[in-house]
Amino acid sequence: MTVFQALVLGIIQGLGEFLPISSSAHLVLVPWLFGWQYAGLTFDVALHLGTLISIAAFFWKEWIVLIGSALRRRGTHEARMFWYLVLATVPGAVMGYLLEEQAETVFRTPLLIGIMLIVMGIFLYWADAKKPAVKGMREISMADSLLIGLSQAFAIIPGVSRSGVTMTAGRALGLSRETAARFSFLLSTPIIVGAGLFKLKDITPGDVNTAFITGVASSALVGFISISFLLKYLTGRSFALFVWYRLVAGLAVIVLAAARQFGF
């Protein structure tokens, strides 16, 4: 892998992990389009490490409050929110563990990715247009958390988008756009930590090179910017921009995949 490729993929990870457009889809599609070889497990760890840095840098104060409240003050909003996030993490973690092999093989076909980009774009539009922006963080219930966590299990399929499906579920349950995004970002922390640690066991110090560092740095920086951008963007706007992007990108991928399939 070249440093340029690492930079491009790091930027894609930083954008796609937090914007509702699917990082896994784009990390499959870009090498497919340009004929790049699979970056390998080592670089997967680099990308997860980068996005972990970005989410930790943005939300570290909130996580300290949540953890501290869970340990010391039962019954508070922050303590409940910590355990809601733990509960919501379980379905996605279980599905990720059980279907890891399929996620790396069967699910990584451009045609399926194109279809899922469109399908989830339609669901996001429906949920965002149907529900009023009512619930804030303090109004999230245990049932809301569990349902959002269950939706996260579908993110094992590239094109669905972990952030996209959890924000869609949040909007369908009546969360405001900013609240749906914030809860999704907090929920991503244990998933990203778990995925990184699970893969980290196979990495040696010799695997850390310039491309690895470039991937970490670019995904971390772009990820931080993406989080900040989306939270501000959604205070006065809808998800329509991302819906249109998913529809257009999904259609383009399907057409291109079909053209390559039939030799055009």
Curated annotation (Swiss-Prot):
Q: Which residues form the signal peptide?
A: none
Q: Which additional comment does the entry carry? A: Bacitracin is thought to be involved in the inhibition of peptidoglycan synthesis by sequestering undecaprenyl diphosphate, thereby reducing the pool of lipid carrier available.
- Any one GO cellular component localisation term in the record: plasma membrane
Subcellular location(s): the record lists: Cell membrane
A matching Pfam family: BacA
Membrane-spanning residues where? Answer: 1-21, 40-60, 81-101, 109-129, 140-160, 183-203, 211-231, 239-259
Name of this chain's protein = Undecaprenyl-diphosphatase
- The Enzyme Commission number assigned here is 3.6.1.27
Q: GO: which molecular function terms?
A: undecaprenyl-diphosphatase activity
Entry superkingdom: Bacteria
Q: Which family does it belong to?
A: Belongs to the UppP family.
Q: Keywords of this protein's UniProt record, alphabetized? A: Antibiotic resistance, Cell membrane, Cell shape, Cell wall biogenesis/degradation, Hydrolase, Membrane, Peptidoglycan synthesis, Transmembrane, Transmembrane helix
Please write the reaction equations for the catalytic activity of this protein: di-trans,octa-cis-undecaprenyl diphosphate + H2O = di-trans,octa-cis-undecaprenyl phosphate + phosphate + H(+)
Biological processes annotated in GO: cell wall organization; peptidoglycan biosynthetic process; regulation of cell shape; response to antibiotic
Q: What does this protein do?
A: Catalyzes the dephosphorylation of undecaprenyl diphosphate (UPP). Confers resistance to bacitracin.
Q: How does it sit in the membrane?
A: Multi-pass membrane protein
